[in-house]
C-alpha cells in the first residue's frame, strides 16, 4: 500500500513538473520568387520543411480591381505580411515607404503588447524593414523595439563593396542567414523575421534565367542554416517552432525582370510551412496577410479587439469558420456572403459608418443581424451613407471584415 502511494505521489510530482513546449515562430521572406520558378527548381530544404507541413500557392496584391488592391512591389508586400492588412489600411505603396499608417500594428508590436515577456528579433538584408516598415522606436508605432536586430549591412560598403553584378547582396544574405542561425541556437526568440534579397536582384537583372535558378538554390541553402538551428532547438530544448517561408511578389509575364502590376504571375506567390494543422484556408490560395494571423494563433496571442477587427488575414492553421467575405449593394439591400469552412454556429454581422481607426481613433460597431454559418450569406435592408461602410463578421472560430464604398 505504501509503495502504491509512493508511486502515485511520484507520478503526480512528475506531471506537475512537465511543461508545455514554448512556442516560437520564424518567418522568412525571400524576395521576388514567383511560384512557377520555385516549383521548377530543386529546393531540398524547402521540400523537407513542406514535407512536415505543407506547400501552397498563395497571392499578393490584395483584391484585383478592388479597394484592397496593393502594388506587387517589395515594401508593400512585406507590410502586407507583417501587419495582416492590405495597402488601403497600412498605406505603403512603394519602396520609399513615405507615410505608413502605424495604427495598423505589426505582428511584433502586437506580440510585445499582449505578452511583454516574449522576445522578438529581425535579421534583414534591408534595414528599412526595421526602421520604416516596423517603425522601430517611433512614437507613432508605439515606441516598439526589437529585442535583437541584425541588419544594415547594405550600408557597409567596406565589408560589402558594392559591385555591378550585385554579388555583394548574396554575401549579405549569407551573413544574415548565418547571423539568424547563430542567434536562434543561443537565444531562440519567440518571434523572428528573416529577409533575404538576392533572388530579386537576379530577377531584375536577368529575368527568367539560369542566374535566377542559381539564386533560388542559394536561398534554399541559406534557409537550411536557419532550419538546422531550429531543429537543434527542438531536439535540445522544450520548444515548438512554427516556420513560414514566403515571398513578396511574383514577376512579370514576359521576361520576369519586372513586377508591380496585377498580372496573374506577378500576384501568384507561395507559402511553405512546417505546420501540420493546416486548414481549408491553406488549401485554397491563401493571401499573404494570413501569415500574421496564423503566427498569432500559433503563439496563443489574441490581438487587442480594435486590431483584430481590422485584420484582413485569417489563420491557415487550426479551426476556421468563414473566409473570403464579400459585400455588395442589391437595390436597397446589403448582401453579405462568405465561404464556409466549418458549418457549425452562427455569424454576427456588425457595421460601422466611420473609419476613425485609420486616424488612431475608435469606430463604433452596431449589430445588423445574425445568420447561420452554413447559409453562407446574409441580407438586410440598409441605407448606405456616402463613403466607407465597414462590415465585421464574427464567427465561432474567426473574425473577418469587408468594406462597402459608396462614392
Can you name each region flagged by the protein language model?
Residues 77-78, 82-85, 260-301:
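Substrate-binding rim/cap in mid-to-C-terminal beta-strand-loop elements of soluble/periplasmic
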Residues 245-274, 404-406:
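Histidine-centered active-site microenvironments of extracellular/periplasmic hydrolases
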Residues 88, 92-93, 99-164:
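Catalytic-site neighborhoods of secreted/periplasmic enzymes
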Residues 36-73, 121:
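Short, structured active-site-proximal loop/turn typified by the sulfatase FGly-forming signature C/S-X-P-X-R
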Residues 333-342:
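Aromatic/hydrophobic beta-strand junction motif of beta-rich domains
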Residues 286, 299-333:
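Polar, surface-exposed loop/tail segments
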Residues 135-138, 150, 178-221, 225:
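Active-site His/acidic residue clusters
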Residues 27, 45, 218-260, 295:
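Metal-dependent active-site segment of extracytoplasmic phospho-/sulfohydrolases and closely related
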Amino acid at each position: 500500500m505504501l509503495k502504491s502511494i509512493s508511486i502515485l505521489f511520484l507520478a503526480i510530482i512528475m506531471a506537475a513538473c512537465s511543461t508545455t513546449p514554448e512556442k516560437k515562430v520564424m518567418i522568412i521572406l525571400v524576395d521576388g520568387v514567383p511560384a512557377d520558378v520555385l516549383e521548377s527548381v530543386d529546393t531540398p530544404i524547402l521540400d523537407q520543411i513542406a514535407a512536415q507541413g505543407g506547400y501552397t500557392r498563395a497571392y499578393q496584391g490584395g483584391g484585383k480591381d478592388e479597394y484592397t488592391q496593393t502594388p506587387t512591389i517589395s515594401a508593400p508586400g512585406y507590410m502586407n505580411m507583417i501587419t495582416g492588412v492590405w495597402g488601403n489600411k497600412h498605406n505603403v505603396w512603394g519602396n520609399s515607404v513615405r507615410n505608413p499608417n502605424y495604427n495598423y500594428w505589426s505582428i511584433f508590436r502586437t506580440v510585445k503588447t499582449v505578452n511583454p515577456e516574449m522576445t522578438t528579433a529581425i535579421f534583414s538584408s534591408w534595414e528599412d524593414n526595421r526602421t520604416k516598415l516596423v517603425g522601430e522606436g517611433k512614437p507613432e508605432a508605439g515606441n516598439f523595439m526589437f529585442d535583437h536586430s541584425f541588419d544594415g549591412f547594405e550600408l557597409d560598403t567596406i565589408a560589402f563593396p558594392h559591385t555591378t553584378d550585385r554579388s555583394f547582396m548574396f554575401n549579405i544574405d549569407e551573413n544574415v542567414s548565418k547571423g539568424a542561425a547563430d542567434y536562434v541556437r543561443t537565444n531562440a526568440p519567440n518571434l523572428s523575421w528573416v529577409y533575404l534579397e538576392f533572388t530579386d536582384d537576379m530577377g531584375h537583372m536577368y529575368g527568367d534565367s539560369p542566374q535566377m535558378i542559381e539564386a533560388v538554390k542559394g536561398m534554399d541553402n541559406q534557409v537550411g542554416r536557419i532550419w538546422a538551428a531550429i531543429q537543434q532547438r527542438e531536439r535540445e530544448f522544450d520548444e515548438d517552432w512554427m516556420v513560414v517561408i514566403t515571398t513578396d511578389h511574383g514577376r512579370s509575364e514576359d521576361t520576369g525582370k519586372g513586377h508591380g502590376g496585377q498580372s496573374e504571375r506577378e500576384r501568384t506567390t507561395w507559402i511553405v510551412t512546417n505546420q501540420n494543422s493546416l486548414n481549408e484556408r491553406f488549401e485554397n490560395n491563401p493571401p499573404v496577410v494570413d501569415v500574421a494571423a496564423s503566427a498569432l494563433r500559433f503563439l496563443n496571442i489574441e490581438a487587442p479587439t480594435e486590431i483584430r477587427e481590422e485584420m484582413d488575414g485569417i489563420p491557415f492553421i487550426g479551426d476556421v469558420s468563414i473566409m473570403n467575405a464579400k459585400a455588395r449593394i442589391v437595390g436597397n439591400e446589403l448582401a453579405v456572403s462568405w465561404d464556409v469552412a466549418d458549418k457549425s454556429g452562427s455569424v454576427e454581422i456588425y457595421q460601422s459608418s466611420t473609419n476613425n481607426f485609420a486616424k488612431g481613433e475608435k469606430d463604433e460597431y452596431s449589430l445588423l443581424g445574425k445568420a447561420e454559418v452554413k447559409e453562407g450569406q446574409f441580407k438586410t435592408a440598409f441605407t448606405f451613407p456616402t463613403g466607407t461602410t465597414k462590415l465585421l463578421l464574427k464567427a465561432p472560430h474567426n473574425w473577418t471584415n469587408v468594406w462597402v464604398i459608396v462614392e
